Amino acid sequence: MKVLFVNGSPRKKWTTAKLLESAAQGAIDADATVKLVHLYDEPFRGCVSCFACKLKNATTNGLCAYKDALTPLLEKARDADAFAIGAPIYFGRASAVTLAFMERLLFPLITYDQRSTRRRAKSRSAGFRFTRKRPRPR
C-alpha cells in the first residue's frame, strides 16, 4: 500500500508535521510505503482557470493540465492508495498553500455535466488534519 502525507505548514518540525509524522509511522508499522511531502518546498501556484481539464476530449486523466513543480506531487496523489493532508488554520481556513494544492488536486475531478462524472481509476482513503493555536486552560 502506498500512502502520501502532505504537510501544508511552513514549519517542518511543529504540530502539523508532528501529527503527520506520527500517522506516517503508523502506516509504516502496517507495512505501507510512505512519502511525506512539504508543500512549502514546492514552487507552485493554485488553479489558473485554464479549464484544460474540462475539455470534452481532455487527456489529463483527472490531473491538472497546468505543468509546474506541483505536477509530480499530483501524480503521486493520483497513484497513492491513501493520502493525508495536514495544515494549520490561518484566518479560519487551511493555509493558502494547502488550499492551492487542493484546488489543483480536486478541481479537475469536478464536472459541470450532470449526465457524466469524472472518476479516478480507483477510489482511495483520504484524511485531513488541521491544527490551530489556542490558549491552554488555566
Show which residues each predicted segment covers.
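N-terminal beta1-alpha1-beta2 submodule of the flavodoxin-like/Rossmannoid cofactor-binding fold
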Residues: 1-114
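Short, glycine-/small-residue-rich phosphate/pyrophosphate-handling segment
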Residues: 96-97, 110-138
